[in-house]
Amino acid sequence: MSKVYDWLDERLEITPFVDDATGKFIPPHVNIFYCLGGITLVCFLIQFATGFAMTFYYRPTVAEAFESVNYIMTQVNFGWLLRSIHRWSASMMVLMMILHTFRVYLTGGFKKPRELTWVTGVILAVLTVSFGVTGYSLPWDQVGYWAVKIVSGVPSAIPVVGDALVQLIRGGEAVGQATLTRFYSLHTFVLPWLTAVFMTMHFLMIRRQGISGPL
């Protein structure tokens, strides 16, 4: 293996990258609460893997969505475990994100020169909540349907553009197939890509600036 590594290192210069990744200085005041952001990332990766697996069986139509989820839970080998892990990690991600935000705020991690790190973190928090809203509707049961109807109707309170926003979200006047298609696309494509981009920016800035010092 050493010969293979040496061959790759000679061409790709792996050693400097490994040294930089593993040799970063960790301030002595860092404790377990500084791991909350990393746990949030782990939860996201778990959801990505389990969600990708479920796309092989889920059908995003109003006629088949509920039955396809039921099929995953009752017919697919370990499908019940797959979906349960997806749901548990989703709840854990939201909890860890909230605790991480509080930790950063209470320790002053948002102050100069880390304002942009804080901004990307806030965007990631919004994306995390958006995951929950869009994913909640995908089983298309009574809870999911009425949740979508209520959430998609909230923008109607906005003056002038409110009704147009509601129609844009729903794909028409009423909640239906177009709404489910939009939420499915957001949940499985748009939001994961946006989250991956902003997480990369977030972690690169942390690597560049380091962990903030104690108050």
Curated annotation (Swiss-Prot):
- Residues that, per the record, bind heme b 2: 86, 187
Q: Name one GO cellular component term.
A: plasma membrane-derived thylakoid membrane
* Keyword ATP-binding included in the entry's annotation: no
What's the record's note on cofactor binding? Binds 2 heme b groups non-covalently with two histidine residues as axial ligands. Binds one heme group covalently by a single cysteine link with no axial amino acid ligand. This heme was named heme ci.
- Give this protein's Gene Ontology molecular function annotations: electron transporter, transferring electrons within cytochrome b6/f complex of photosystem II activity; metal ion binding; oxidoreductase activity
Family annotation (Gene3D superfamilies): Cytochrome Bc1 Complex, Chain C
Q: What is its main location?
A: membrane
Which cofactors does it use?
A: heme b; heme c
| Residues noted as binding heme c in the record, renumbered to the chain | 35
Tell me the compartments it is located in.
Cellular thylakoid membrane
Q: Where are the transmembrane segments?
A: 32-52, 90-110, 116-136, 186-206
Q: Which UniProt keywords apply?
A: Electron transport, Heme, Iron, Membrane, Metal-binding, Photosynthesis, Thylakoid, Transmembrane, Transmembrane helix, Transport
Q: Name one GO biological process term.
A: photosynthesis
Q: Which CDD domains match?
A: Cytochrome_b_N (cd00284)
NCBIfam families to which the protein is assigned, alphabetical: PRK03735.1
Relate the protein's function as given in its record.
Component of the cytochrome b6-f complex, which mediates electron transfer between photosystem II (PSII) and photosystem I (PSI), cyclic electron flow around PSI, and state transitions.
Describe the family membership recorded for this protein in Swiss-Prot or TrEMBL: Belongs to the cytochrome b family. PetB subfamily.
Q: What else is known?
A: Heme 1 (or BH or b566) is high-potential and absorbs at about 566 nm, and heme 2 (or BL or b562) is low-potential and absorbs at about 562 nm.
Subunit-structure text: The 4 large subunits of the cytochrome b6-f complex are cytochrome b6, subunit IV (17 kDa polypeptide, PetD), cytochrome f and the Rieske protein, while the 4 small subunits are PetG, PetL, PetM and PetN. The complex functions as a dimer.
Task: Specify the protein name.
Answer: Cytochrome b6
Q: Which gene encodes it?
A: petB
